[in-house]
Amino acid sequence: MKTMIISSSPNRIGLTNSCVDTCIKTLQELNVETKWIVLNQYNIKKCEACGKRGWGICLEEHICRMEDDFNNLQEEMGEYDNFIIVSPVYFYEMSESAKTFFDRLKRFNDNSKIKGKKIVCIACAGGSGTEQKKH
């Protein structure tokens, strides 16, 4: 079994990455192959809603015309059985990098590389996860 963990926090020492560390440790104890993807380290542009009625070649050819890291990441996702998505909560929403990624992934609907696969989403709220300094 292979699980891809996708996180979307730019803070390398915060609560979100602490959750990722726990997931990785637990999965490794269960002998599950894991890969950690940090969305903020990828060049993933916002969807431009190209083509007719805002649907470009993504609807028919199942690839995006934009030249960034999205197509390769989506292709790699097809090699995994399960996904854990971990995002900080910013202003009652997932992070911008997570939102951008999901907006692009959604354009592929029924032909997505992750169709039928299991996904767990973890929303991390409540602070940075680092110790607070007292003044």
Roles of regions detected by a PLM:
Residues 96-97, 109-135:
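Short, glycine-/small-residue-rich phosphate/pyrophosphate-handling segment
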Residues 1-108:
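N-terminal beta1-alpha1-beta2 submodule of the flavodoxin-like/Rossmannoid cofactor-binding fold
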